[in-house]
């Protein structure tokens, strides 16, 4: 599970939400440590089919999997997404909310304290010296789990 998904699970739990974290089958063990109430393999259609009505879905990835989740959102439920309203949401009784990053120093400070206290973590994929930035950029472009850190 990537950094955005980890943060979404963490923040949702802080607000008292019943959290179902959607990950690839290969990531289920790792996701269990995040404290979600349920882990759902998004690459397993039978697991998706087992879903009941959902009050809301937060799509932090933007892949085609959202199409299979939309039918499970209850009438007048919420779809929060990073990529705008998907076509599959047209004609459905749900509210689509576009998620945009907003700088907020107080929230970032709170997360920083939680990281320092060991209550929240983001995996580090690899550290590079600043002088080796030419190697970091292609790795970042490929995507993957964990953050790439540049150090002086």
Model regions: which residues?
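Terminal helix/beta-alpha structural elements that buttress the NAD(P)+-binding lobe
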Residues: 1-152
